[in-house]
Amino acid sequence: EPNMDALIIPVTMEVPCDSRGQRMWWAFLASSMVTFFGGLFIILLWRTLKYLWTVCCHCGDKTKEAQKINNGSSQADGTLKPVDEKEEAVAAEVGWMTSVKDWAGVMISAQTLTGRVLVVLVFALSIGALVIYFIDSSNPIESCQNFYKDFTLQIDMAFNVFFLLYFGLRFIAANDNLWFWLEVNSVVDFFTVPPVFVSVYLNRSWLGLRFLRALRLIQFSEILQFLNILKTSNSIKLVNLLSIFISTWLTAAGFIHLVENSGDPWENFQNSQALTYWECVYLLMVTMSTVGYGDVYAKTTPGGLFIVFFILGGLAMFASYVPEIIEIIGNRKKYGGSYSAVSGRKHIVVCGHITLESVSHFLKDFLHKDRDDVNVEIVFLHNISPNLELEALFKRHFTQVEFYQGSVLNPHDLARVKIESADACLILANKYCDDPDAEDASNIMRVISIKNYHPKIRIITQMLQYHNKAHLLNIPSWNWKEGDDAICLAELRLGFIAQSCLAQGLSTMLANLFSIGSFIKIEEDTWHKYYLEGVSNEMYTEYLSSAFVGLSFPTVCELCFVKLKLLMIAIEYKSANRESRILINPGNHLKIQEGTSGFFIASDAKEVKRAFFYCKACHNDITDPKRIKKCGCKRLEDEQPSTLSPKKKQRNGGMRNSPSSSPKLMRHDPLLIPGNDQIDNMDSNVKKYDSTGMFHWCAPKEIEKVISTRSEAAMTVLSGHVVVCIFGHVSSALIGLRNLVMPLRASNFHYHELKHIVFVGSIEYLKREWETLHNFPKVSILPGTPLTRADLRAVNINLCDMCVILSANQNNIDDTSLQDKECILASLNIKSMQFDDSIGVLQANSQGFTPPGMDKSSPDNSPVHGMLRQPSITTGVNIPIITELVNDTNVQFLDQDDDDDPDTELYLTQPFACGTAFAVSVLDSLMSATYFNDNILTLIRTLVTGGATPELEALIAEENALRGGYSTPQTLANRDRCRVAQLALLDGPFADLGDGGCYGDLFCKALKTYNMLCFGIYRLRDAHLSTPSQCTKRYVITNPPYRFELVPTDLIFCLMQFDHNAGQSRASLSHSSHSSQSSSKKSSSVHSIPSTANRQNRPKSRESRDKQTEKKWFTDEPDNAYPRNIQIEPMSTHMANQINQYKSTSSLIPPIREVEDEC
């Protein structure tokens, strides 16, 4: 009876397949064996017959060939024999079979899209059949199943039908059918496909050898190579090892599961044991590892024999494969891999100097919440794996940031990050490196590598030294017209500082404009409240509505400010030949065209949309600017999409030039070309400007001619000048002082308006910089050290307009807190100095300027306008100073009376808000700003460099020096560009608005009357207090609202038009070219101390002293120089302290020209 029970298979009432319980496993196995051996017999029989046919017919073929040769002459007429027709038919048949075979080969080799789909589908279905086997392994080995009711059997049947078709394709494509029949994949099909058809016929299922489907895993690596997923040798090897190991393991477990659950046939299947498939997997693992716990073991004879042989092979495989797999995985780069581009999402590649500081600053600005539509993924590529802090930063931004380890100098790594499909590549520089030239060389090599791999990729790179920008022009595929940009940190940071010498606080305002800053609301009435309201403003660009077409720039600017609450400072103008240029406050001569885009200062990108949506018909009566939205009128803006915003790059296809990069666009008023008097007096043989007409120029001077000793400098009273205190030695890295001097020598200043520049520092260092400075006028050198007070007194630092403190030794110190020690010590040294007040009060160049026409003084007194200035400062605290810092946290040491927390961000500190401190880190925001709008960089460079153009850079790249040019109408036309100035409200035509007036009224009056565009206020820090304060510190307010109340001591930032007539009155004062050379010793900022009260004797005494000492400080004065008049007037010390040393210009502004009201 027990024997009978062992023979009975499970029988259900619905499916009475065998009432006797007879096993039918042999039928399933026989189907596979018959298929295999039957096919093998047919192949061998076919080959044998084919061989015999070939041997037998070999002699007959030779006889036919002989007959053909003998009868060839009789067929000279060209007719074909029937034999030829038969041969053509045979050839056609062979060709058809060959084409079918080739097609089948292509289908299984994944050379086409259909083939790749087929290969992947076969593998996927094989894994699916294996999963079905795993599911069925929980059932008995043999059971009754109805095909029409068993869902898994139906799926398995469908899979095997597909395998049968695929087997046919493989058979057709096989070059050798015998070897194909013996392949592993063929054997798998023989023992898995036929049993399924037998199952349908017998209505019963046998688990059998279906586990052989696991052997398909061996092809996993091959399929991944077909799909071009695996490319590296390590990845291919790793997948091969894993697939062979796992497939062998699963297949062996399937065999143990079959024999152990079936039992020995010769024992009448009585020694079977119920083991699940996963217990067999466990058994094989402990067997391979030779652990053998004994909890599970084989009881059947086939199982035991299999285990004996499996230990031999399995142990060898386990001992060799597992260590190799672990080694490959362990040595595999954590940040290897390749970037997978997401459809519909752009990505950029960031490389170069990748550190926690540089990446955090970049991500903070790039992913700022104000950029609400940034759909860009950031891919960092660096050859060093990130440390734990940087890795944590990447994980915090994992949705938008990925890191890959590699080098941009390796084309394979560039392919990994998909540089060819990247929207741009950004290269960061190490601002604190010891060797800036070496760092620039590294970045240039990165550019060369990237451009060599993909010439069309847009690159934005940081450069440290200005002279290294020239090397980028040597790269053939470098094209700034297509968006390639080089952000030169030396050029910009020194340009910002130079503009602060002309209008103190401007560096802070510009830095806040191109960086994204969140609005921080402060309720109490302090200077922080108004400063932070301005910090929330940024620079945006947007197309102008068609309602502005035909109006002049001042009219549109006023309308935007008054009605739309937007401040427009520049436009992108497209000339007739479609060349695009940025024009800053171009004046009333220019009319707005269709498709013109404007540059706006606003707090939100949504606000700027008002300029695009504005419709005169629909919005003319609206007073609330928030209600200005897209109306139903059919306008041109509806047809042309708005693409200019801070979040979208501007690609116009034209040239991105500075306002004066080309003289093609000229004023349409008679002031553009010099008057007849100027042309008559203009000596065409005298070079006063460089060849582009953008900067004042003089013949190269030897450095010995501009060097003065301390005693010689003390004999000359300098006033209204710029003192540059520089720390450096013979081996220090060059700062690039040319970038500081060039903005101060811009040609839109008249010669008498140029501030004299005095360098105080090591002569060994300045000799290295002199090659780039010897073409600029009004430059002097005092060898010494800025820490010596005697040197500072010798250059009259208490009478200067600005003291700049720079250091070339900042990056040679490992301790970051000590990097700025020299600059901080010099700043504190100056602030602690005391000065004598015995000279009196000098009415000289003022903090602001007063428009001409308000002062009817004589020509001799005409240069003297505006506010009164106290030159004899009693304490160094009131000296205007701007200090450059490397480490932002060191800003806390500059002001001893501030309450800034050491952890306060730089832009929130008092020294930065007051414009007395500048750090190169604020320029990091330019990378993001340039990517989203490449015209922003052009605008910033135009404002801070004084007019540097691509043409000028090409010239400097050629000669590394400015080339002198003759004064022609074309070069003089380039002088006609606006500049930044500060307008005083204490007196002059705007004095009535200074006492409680409205900023909006001042804006409109200045714009209509003088074409001056106001954009900010430089206000005393304690102006909001009801009680008077002795503090002379000021802070910056950017773009105040219309109703903002003014105070008399305010200084207004404005964009001032070039005055063509200011130079003519000066020329009328000049004498002959020989006699004027003597008077030229009296520059606009140099006053000698008289030995007597007789003022007429001063030029002669100075001339005689020059002959005796043979020291010529100013040998390059123009012929129209004039002696400066000094008037002594009493003045209250309190008022002087509030308004002194904040002078940006002493120029006369153009005559009053009323602007027509076009609104």
UniProtKB/Swiss-Prot annotation:
Keywords, alphabetical: Calcium, Cell membrane, Ion channel, Ion transport, Lipoprotein, Magnesium, Membrane, Metal-binding, Palmitate, Phosphoprotein, Potassium, Potassium channel, Potassium transport, Transmembrane, Transmembrane helix, Transport, Voltage-gated channel
Regulation: Ethanol and carbon monoxide-bound heme increase channel activation. Heme inhibits channel activation.
Origin species: Canis lupus familiaris (Dog)
Domain of life: Eukaryota
Segment S10: region residues: 912-932
Compositional bias (Low complexity): 1066-1091
Lipidation (S-palmitoyl cysteine): 56-57, 59
Domain RCK N-terminal positions: 345-487, 719-863
Biased composition, class Basic and acidic residues, residue ranges: 1100-1115
Protein name: Calcium-activated potassium channel subunit alpha-1
Chain intervals for the UniProt region annotation (Segment S7): 494-514
Tissue expression remark: Expressed in all vascular and smooth muscles.
